Amino acid sequence: MRVTRFSFSTLLLSLTLLAGCAGQSCDEPLSGEACRDEKLLYQNDMLQAKLLIAAGDPENYELAGALLKRAGPGDTRGEVPFYQAVLLINEGPQLEEVLDLLEKAAARKHPHAIALLYKIWSEPFLATEADPLRAELYRARYADLDVAKSGYPSFEKAQAVVNTLVDRSNPAGAQVSGR
């Protein structure tokens, strides 16, 4: 009987250790140099692109676009297509391309993409006419997000961020940084 307990304990410990190795993310210092480097470069590219877009200077848009393109393969949360859509809006809206990018980001449950889709169809913004039913669908999709259930960011806060990013009369982007 004692051998069975030891074997079971050993098996349980082994499975736990194996699961830990398999589930290790690139955020861990021991996750491997290449994995960690890719994660850090992705984070750097996204941070730089966001800052360039929030600054609102059209001279920075080409670099922001290149950074987003390079970050694309590492994106799992829909950030890249969301910020690509914001870039297109700020450069001069092409509605179909913007909608395609936002739908890609929304499919990955990006909260700001869903808030921007709501804005497009509720005001209307970019679209020629409002579509209240479609807008409500996006409002409901936002409410189903895990972040919405936790209360951060609230729908109103997500809308404020979106408004700051696409409002060409406020190029400073001060609200985006939380000031």
Where are these regions (language model features)?
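Structural signature of tandem alpha-helical TPR/SEL1-like repeats
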Residues: P58-A66, E91-L101, T128-R134
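C-terminal motif of bacterial Sec signal peptides marking the signal peptidase cleavage site
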Residues: L17-G20
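Bacterial N-terminal signal peptides that target proteins for export
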Residues: M1-L11
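Terminal, low-structured helical/coil segments at or just beyond the last alpha-helical repeat
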Residues: E129-R179
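Short helix-capping/linker turns of helical repeat alpha-solenoids
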Residues: E38-D45, L52-G56, N60, P73-P81, ...
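Bacterial signal peptide processing site
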Residues: A22-S25
